């Protein structure tokens, strides 16, 4: 009988960040820095760079998972991806491209 399970996870966080103050400034006075930090809880937030698409970030997270677990990539049958994109048309899940 085949067993199913999660043996590890990986993460990728973009190198570029925006601060709560920068977010407040972009609202042109609608939100103060204090409101962004205290009410929304955002002190700094990662922001994807030019090369940080959903699939690219997913692949980097997958490489991190492989490094953390020592699993041979050829032994993986399925990849679950929780990356998110918004478009006005149907999209294929990034997990298919990452695998």
Segments the model singles out, each with a brief description of its role:
Residues 1-80:
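Conserved "HGTGT" condensation-loop signature of ketosynthase/thiolase-family condensing enzymes
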Residues 23, 80-99:
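Active-site-proximal gating segment of KS-fold condensing enzymes and close homologs
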């Amino acid at each position: 009988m085949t067993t199913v399970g999660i043996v590890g996870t990986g993460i990728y966080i973009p190198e570029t960040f925006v601060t709560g103050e920068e977010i407040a400034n972009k609202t042109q006075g609608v939100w103060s820095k204090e409101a962004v930090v205290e009410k929304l809880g955002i002190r700094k937030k990662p922001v994807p760079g030019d090369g940080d698409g959903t699939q690219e970030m997913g692949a980097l997270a997958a490489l991190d998972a492989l490094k953390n677990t020592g699993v041979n990539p050829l032994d993986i049958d399925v990849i679950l991806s929780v990356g998110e994109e918004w478009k006005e048309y149907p999209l294929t899940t990034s997990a298919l491209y990452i695998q």
